[in-house]
């Protein structure tokens, strides 16, 4: 039995190591699922909850224990675009609007993204979006370009440099079936072909659906829903015993916001929540997973004026057809989730993923 001096020394040592009662050091998450509602502000979340469940505060991720708000200005200040805000989320560094994960302002060097950080640890990686996959948000995680308009170069960055194991989203805009097949990817172009994949025995898949953003919910035709893409990505990536990083973007929330289309905005946000539910279902019972749900920026300057009950669109007003400077919500579940709270900057999420021994 330890004497009192030895017990005191052990207690101090445990605290120094971070495993005593005054704090705990967790391992880095083995699995990271990073879900981004493009253009999804606090009011978009409220509106979707009212429509889906009759009350605000009822979307799946709103039940997470840890939540906060993110500021999201670009390096030059003012209103962010998806390139600058996406880069801040992906790299933890501020850049100018339009820049994809390069130090601009600065020396123009490539900034390491969360996807690259996790890949360097031996993890599989994936990008999923309802926009075309070379659009700014997925590009920020898997490419390095001085302008978001370099879609052909972004596709080449995916294909030749970062090589995510799974890429699923809208096609065209620099994407090429033949080029990705030549680079070792199995390419699928519709929902049925995607869902027929042998997800237990395939590790390089590129879904190029159509020739631009996917259709608005709920009428997808032959194209997959966001939830179906997320579930497919999870089934492929979880074959890796070393873990994975998956970014899932509900991109069409933003498109609806730019045109002030209330029904489409609500339907897209509800489908985004369905994708979050798929992530939660996959992660249930695990102690090695981090789920982050957030947005890059708010689109439309939305205000919810009245709740009209479940199944009815709430009464809203829009103040712009562009982005706003509003803070955006952030929610976290799992490993390191307790680092989320209060008002944070979007650059801080990088360290939530990477913190740990």
Describe the residue ranges of each PLM region.
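Bacterial N-terminal signal peptides that target proteins for export
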Residues: 1-10
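Bacterial N-terminal signal peptides
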Residues: 9-21
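Active-site regions of oxyanion-processing enzymes, predominantly non-cytosolic
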Residues: 25, 166, 196-208, 229-251
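N-terminal catalytic scaffold of extracellular/periplasmic and nuclease hydrolases
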Residues: 25-171, 176-198, 203, 270-273, ...
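Generic enzyme active-site microenvironment
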Residues: 36, 247, 293-295
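Functional beta-strand-loop-alpha-helix junction segments that form "active/interaction loops"
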Residues: 107, 188-230
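Active-site His/acidic residue clusters
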Residues: 136-142, 211-218, 233-234, 238-276, ...
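Extended C-terminal subregions enriched in glycine
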Residues: 261-307
């Amino acid at each position: 039995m330890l004497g009192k001096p030895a017990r005191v020394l052990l207690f101090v040592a445990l605290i120094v190591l971070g495993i005593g009662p005054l704090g705990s050091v967790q391992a880095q998450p083995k699995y990271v699922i990073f879900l981004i509602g493009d253009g999804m502000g606090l009011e978009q979340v409220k509106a979707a909850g009212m429509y889906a469940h009759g009350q605000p505060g009822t979307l799946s991720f709103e039940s997470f224990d840890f939540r906060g708000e993110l500021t999201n200005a670009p390096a030059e200040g003012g209103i962010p675009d998806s390139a600058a805000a996406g880069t801040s989320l992906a790299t933890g560094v501020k850049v100018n609007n339009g820049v994809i994960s390069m130090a601009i302002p600065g020396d123009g060097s490539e900034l390491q993204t969360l996807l690259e950080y996790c890949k360097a640890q031996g993890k599989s990686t994936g990008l999923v979006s309802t926009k075309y996959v070379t659009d700014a948000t997925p590009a920020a995680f898997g490419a390095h370009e001085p302008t978001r308009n370099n879609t052909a170069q972004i596709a080449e960055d995916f294909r030749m440099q970062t090589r995510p194991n799974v890429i699923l989203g809208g096609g065209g805009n620099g994407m090429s079936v033949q080029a990705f097949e030549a680079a070792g990817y199995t390419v699928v172009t519709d929902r049925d072909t995607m869902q027929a994949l042998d997800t237990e025995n395939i590790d390089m898949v590129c879904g190029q659906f159509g020739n631009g953003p996917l259709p608005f919910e709920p009428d997808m035709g032959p194209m997959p829903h966001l939830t179906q893409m997320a579930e497919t990505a999870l089934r492929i990536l979880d074959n890796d015993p070393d873990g994975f990083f998956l970014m899932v973007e509900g991109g069409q929330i933003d498109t609806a916001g730019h045109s002030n289309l209330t029904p489409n905005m609500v339907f897209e946000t509800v489908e985004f929540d369905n994708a979050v539910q798929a992530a939660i279902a996959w992660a249930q019972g695990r102690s090695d997973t981090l789920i982050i749900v957030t947005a890059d920026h708010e689109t439309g300057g939305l205000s919810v004026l009245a709740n009209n009950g479940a199944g009815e669109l709430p009464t809203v007003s829009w103040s712009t057809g562009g982005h706003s400077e509003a803070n955006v919500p952030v929610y976290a579940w799992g490993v390191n989730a307790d680092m989320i709270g209060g008002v944070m900057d979007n650059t801080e999420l990088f360290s939530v993923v990477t913190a740990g021994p």
